Structures are given as C-alpha cells and as structure tokens.
Amino acid sequence: KFDDAFMTTYRNALQEILEGKGYEVTIVDGNNDQAKQNEQINTFITQGVDALIINPVMTSAADQIISTVKGADVPTVLINREPTADQMSAYDKLVYVGCDAAQSGTFQGELILDTENKGDINGDGKVSYIMIQGDPENIDAQLRTEYSVKALTDAGVEVEQLDLQRGDWDRNKGQEICQNDLAKYGDQIEVVFCNNDDMAIGALQAIQAAGRTVNKDIYLVGVDALDAAKNEV
C-alpha cells in the first residue's frame, strides 16, 4: 500500500536521498490498480523520464512492465515484488531491490524456537497459530508465510494452523483478524504470525484488549523493524 508505514518510510527516505543528490523526483500512487499503474508508467515514458522505480501492484504484471520499459529503453528499478530470474534477464537495464523474504520468514520461526517452550505454551505437543498474511499474490508474503512455519517443522515441531487470513499489510485489518480469532479460538492460539509489522501492531492491540500478554501467554512476530514495532519489543 502506498500509505502504509513501510512504504511511507521507504518513499520518504528515497525522495530525500535522490533530491539531496540533485535529482528531480515525481511520485505517484497506483491505488492498488495495475491498469492505472500501467498508464502511469506509459505517461512517465512519454514525458521522457531518465529512470523509473516501480513497486508493481501485481507480481503477475512483471512481464508487461518489463516489456514496456525495455521497449522505451528506460533504466528501471523494481522493488518489493521480486520477478523471476528469467524475467530479470530479459532486460539489461533492469534491477530488483528487496529483502530475502524466505529469510525473513525463517527468522520469525526461529524466534519462536528460541522461546523456552518453542511456542508450545499449553504443553499439548504442538504449536497452534494464526497467520495474518499481507497479500497472497505478493511473493514476499508467500515466502514469509511458508518459511516462518517451515522453520518450526524443520526443527521437528508439530504445528496446527487455526486460521490464515489476508490482512493486506494493514494495521486495522490485522487488529480485526486477530480480534475475531481470539474470540473464536481463545487460549488455543499460541502464536500469531504477521507478514509485516503494521499488521503485527494491530494484532498487538487486539491481544492487549483481550487481556493477554505477549511473550507470556501468547507469542507475536512481524517483519520490517518499524520504529513503532521496535518500541513494543
């Protein structure tokens, strides 16, 4: 999302750095609409921009985006939604900048493994969790979702997924999902996995409202190291 905490932090830092180096920067919001973003890309190309930095609305749009910028011979940086190696090799003026999403997920699982009970708070021999996913179409969300749990199962820990819901990287949705799941599953929930910190902050609000305490009777993990999240650690 254009205005979520992570993208806002990224966008502001990017603009400050580029303008500090003397570049003229124009930023537009694709409004989570791939067709609109395609139009914006074409408009920038028509205007004769020197380079593009694009956070694709949809991972599946990578081929079309790459074809467009290659046809216009515009150097392009893709962020946040990683194309395949074959897609990246299609244009020699294309680069991708992003984190290792599988590693992020693995770190989440390892944090749970590092607790004294390895996430099995109620001692029933398994870790029961809910997963609040960002956007299932986003490769980072897919990998964080998969590898957070894989870290547990690879360590021989039995897991039980109570719920997996799409939170769209949004704090309010994270709170709503966690609130509803806490009402439905209660003390069965031992771990709340969130694909990003904004949703984790929302989940924390729901956990606190339910009278539970993180790292005591429930575990909660996110990704991004937002200041607001670090302040809660």
Give the residues covered by each predicted segment:
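A residue-level marker of the well-folded mature domains of exported/periplasmic proteins
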Residues: 1-233
